[in-house]
């Protein structure tokens, strides 16, 4: 699903001795060495699982945290159902669609929609990112306030196109896509997460196939998040567009969403 990412080396570390056993299980599951000189490390500590680049000028670690920080702020002050993403997927009075986020990443958008009451299924194809997301969801389930939101988020790991083409059970009403765009803007290079993930993920170059699979599966609509000035994904044209300052949502309607 990507161009060929550069060959980055990574090991598994336990930051405290009492996490050694759990770190060993992650290492076995992900096929990571426990020792050796590497470019990156997946670390397990008291704050959970985190990915960090090693070296003098490396940025800090990245972890998934749905309880505190940016996720908590957006949950409390983010604008609720008036947010553009909510409008794009069809959230309105009496309507909370079942949504598949086929490009979950660190789960931020899925968490926003789950916090608004949507039942979410998430797909993440990169095992390291999926591990961070799984760990973040497990910690969220331990928080009294956030646990009901996390309970609405189900994580699948694998190739989104394959999973959508072989979908079992009731189809999602809405499929949400946020393909990693080949960034040319130099400012994007300084973003910590982009810098960390690019060696493992690369750019999504088969977005047209992803969109086609989504359109075939979704019962009501497909929504694609894009940089504001980026072209639409090749293939079917969006029915309408919601545009913000830096990004936009291309909406492909199939059927009107109705309340229960």
Curated annotation (Swiss-Prot):
Its main location: cytoplasm. Signal peptide: none annotated. GO terms for cellular component: cytoplasm. The keyword Protease does not apply. It comes from the Bacteria. It catalyses: guanosine(1516) in 16S rRNA + S-adenosyl-L-methionine = N(2)-methylguanosine(1516) in 16S rRNA + S-adenosyl-L-homocysteine + H(+). It holds the Pfam family SAM_MT. One of its GO terms (molecular function) is rRNA (guanine-N2-)-methyltransferase activity. Its EC number is 2.1.1.242. It is an enzyme of class 2 (transferase). It is found in: Cytoplasm. InterPro entries: 16SrRNA_methylTrfase_J, SAM-dependent_MTases_sf. S-adenosyl-L-methionine binds at residues 108-109, 124-125, 178. Keywords: Cytoplasm, Methyltransferase, rRNA processing, S-adenosyl-L-methionine, Transferase. Specifically methylates the guanosine in position 1516 of 16S rRNA. Belongs to the methyltransferase superfamily. RsmJ family. HAMAP family: 16SrRNA_methyltr_J. This is Ribosomal RNA small subunit methyltransferase J. It comes from Ectopseudomonas mendocina (strain ymp). The gene is rsmJ.
